[in-house]
Amino acid sequence: MGKLAICPGSFDPITNGHLDIIQRGANVFEEVIVTVFNNQSKSPLFSVTERIELLEDSIKHIPNVSVDSSSRLLMDYAREKKAHAVIRGLRAVSDFEYEMQITSMNRKLNEDIETLFMMTNNQYSFLSSSMVKEIAKYDGNISGLVPEPVEKALKAKFNYL
C-alpha cells in the first residue's frame, strides 16, 4: 500500500492492543505517525507529554513509526501531514458503530483521506486503556496487557513501586 498513515488515539495509556494495530499498520504503510489527541469526554491519567514519552518508549523498535500530538481536528492534521489514510483499531462489533459515525464525519471533512479499520488480534479483543487503569489502580497484574514502560509508569502513578 505504501505512503503515510495516521494512527490517532488518546493512548491513556497505550496497551498491547494499540501496539498490535500500530505494528500491523507499520507493515502496510511506509510511514505511520501515532498521534495523541485529547478526548474531551475523558479525564486523562497521563499528560500528553507523558503519553508521548510512553508511546516513544513502546514503539522505538518499529523504525517507520513516529509519535506526535495534536489538538486540531484529525482531518486537518492528516491533511497537513499529507497522510493517505487513518488507521483505526476495532476490538469488537460494538466498536464499529461508533467508529462508523466518526468515519462518516471525517469523510465529510476530507473525502481524500481513507479510514482503514483493523481488527485487533483476538488476545486483545477485551482490552481497553480504561480497564488497564482500573486493574493497575488496585495493584492488579497488568503484565502482558501493556508494554513494560507503561506497566512501570502505571505502578509509579498509583504508588506501587
Curated annotation (Swiss-Prot):
The keyword Thylakoid does not apply. InterPro entries: Cyt_trans-like, PPAT, Rossmann-like_a/b/a_fold. Pfam families: CTP_transf_like. GO terms for biological process: coenzyme A biosynthetic process. Homohexamer. Keywords: ATP-binding, Coenzyme A biosynthesis, Cytoplasm, Magnesium, Nucleotide-binding, Nucleotidyltransferase, Transferase. It is found in: Cytoplasm. It comes from Oceanobacillus iheyensis (strain DSM 14371 / CIP 107618 / JCM 11309 / KCTC 3954 / HTE831). The keyword ATP-binding applies. This is Phosphopantetheine adenylyltransferase. Its main location: cytoplasm.
